[in-house]
Every structure is written in C-alpha cells, then in structure tokens.
Amino acid sequence: ASCGSTTVTAKNLISLAKKQVDYILGENPAKMSYMVGFGERYPQHVHHRGSSLPSVHAHPNPIPCNAGFQYLYSSSPNPNILVGAILGGPDSRDSFSDDRNNYQQSEPATYINAPLVGALAFFAANPVAN
C-alpha cells in the first residue's frame, strides 16, 4: 500500500500495530496500562457503574439511582476491578486523568475494546510477528 510517495508494507503495519498494543499495555509516557488489572499500574477510578458501586456482599441493600452519585464522585478507588477493560486513555497531550467522572478517558466501551481484541488475536496467531 502507498501513502503519498511512501510505500507501506505489511511489516510496517504489523510493527505499528505492535507499538500501539504495547502503548495501551504500559509502554507509554505515563508507564500505565490502560487495560484495567494489567501490569503494576492501571486506572483505579473506572467510569463503570458495576465497578464503582459496592458489591452486593459488601452492601446487601439496594442502592437507589440518586444514591449512586456519592460513588461516582468518590475519590476512593473502585471496589470492583473491571479486569481486562480498556479505557478511553490519554488525551492528545498524553495526559490521563484517573477520574471516574471524566468518562472520555475513564470509560470502557465496545468501540474501544473491540479493535484491541483483533490486534491481540493476530499476535496470538502469529507469534513470529511479535
């Protein structure tokens, strides 16, 4: 494939994809994995109701809708680790605010997680490409 006068090979694209996966998993300026539960440093304040509310074992009574805001605005880490979720990640300046109220950066979504699944499937099927 070409991009202007530059030829882009499959090897170039695979290398770029590997760098992007490595970035998501912690090889970035923040030295933080944007996959929750992966590595030594990962986001603690995920914008996800099930992850940020106490479990039914810790809080057996129902939590009414409006009572959930105290958990949204809490500075405490999420009581339930949403292992494997990929968050929105850093902004255009490579800055990341680990703040569950900043949904642009701290919310996991299918359109964020799905592309990584494809890349990881490729690298799992092609270990030599790693």
From Swiss-Prot:
InterPro entries: 6-hairpin_glycosidase_sf, 6hp_glycosidase-like_sf, Glyco_hydro_9, Glyco_hydro_9_Asp/Glu_AS, Glyco_hydro_9_His_AS
E.C. number: 3.2.1.4
Cross-referenced PROSITE patterns: GH9_2, GH9_3
Catalytic reaction equation(s): Endohydrolysis of (1->4)-beta-D-glucosidic linkages in cellulose, lichenin and cereal beta-D-glucans
GO biological process, one term: fruit ripening
GO MF term list: cellulase activity
Top-tier EC class: hydrolase
Transmembrane segments: none
Active site feature: H47, D98, E107
Key words, A-Z: Carbohydrate metabolism, Cellulose degradation, Fruit ripening, Glycosidase, Hydrolase, Polysaccharide degradation
Keyword Hydrolase on entry: yes
UniProt entry tagged with the keyword Hydrolase: yes
General function of this protein: Involved in ripening fruit process.
Family to which the UniProt record says this protein belongs: Belongs to the glycosyl hydrolase 9 (cellulase E) family.
The protein's name: Endoglucanase 2
Origin species: Persea americana
Gene that encodes it: CEL2
